[in-house]
From Swiss-Prot:
SUPFAM superfamilies: L9 N-domain-like, Ribosomal protein L9 C-domain
Keyword Chaperone in record: no
GO terms of molecular function: rRNA binding; structural constituent of ribosome
Keyword Iron-sulfur: no
Annotated source species: Streptococcus equi subsp. equi (strain 4047)
Family, per entry: Belongs to the bacterial ribosomal protein bL9 family.
Function (record text): Binds to the 23S rRNA.
Name of the protein: Large ribosomal subunit protein bL9
Matches recorded under Gene3D superfamilies: Ribosomal protein L9, C-terminal domain (3.10.430.100), Ribosomal protein L9, N-terminal domain (3.40.5.10)
UniProt-listed GO biological process terms: translation
GO cellular component: ribonucleoprotein complex; ribosome
HAMAP family assigned to the protein according to its UniProt record, in alphabetical order: Ribosomal_bL9 (MF_00503)
Length: 150
């Protein structure tokens, strides 16, 4: 019997996969526990439609990420920060991913999720700093920061 897996089943199939399994196993286990459904022509058509919609959505997200990368890679895109500095040359406050995200939105109208900004630790130094940002699993860019003394 052909079934469409609704969830990953270890050793049998992954979600969205169409596979031939023994009839008894399909009826008594997979279908009863909502792990799979029978692969009728209507169900297969529905699955193909969902997969196409998902691919289209992923392509749009990737295109958006590439557009943001183009903006961030532009030399003019440099996020400005004015911070109070102590006698040792370190800032009093630290610059976090959240602060960078907010300033990027404020100064350039570019929305980047703070969780995508890769910071090992908050920035406390002044000067020009480049911070990597993972916009998509395939797209990585760098945000240029200019941290000056207030």
């Amino acid at each position: 019997m052909k079934v469409i897996f609704l969830v990953d089943v270890k050793g049998k199939g992954k979600k969205g996969e169409i596979k031939e399994v023994p009839t008894g196993y399909a009826q008594n286990f997979l279908i009863k526990k909502n792990l799979a459904k029978e692969a009728s022509s209507q169900a297969i058509g529905q699955l193909r439609g969902q997969q196409k919609a998902e691919e289209k959505a992923q392509a749009e997200i990737l295109a958006e990420a590439k557009a943001v990368k183009k903006i961030l890679d532009d030399e003019k895109t440099r996020v400005q920060f004015k911070e109070k500095v102590g006698p040792d040359g370190r800032t009093f406050g630290s610059i976090t991913a959240k602060k960078i995200s907010e300033e990027l939105q404020k100064q350039f109208k570019v929305k980047v999720d703070k969780r995508h900004i890769v910071l090992d630790h908050p920035i406390r130094a002044i000067g020009l700093i480049e911070v990597p940002v993972k916009l998509h699993k395939e797209v990585t860019a760098e945000i240029k920061l200019n941290i000056a003394e207030a």
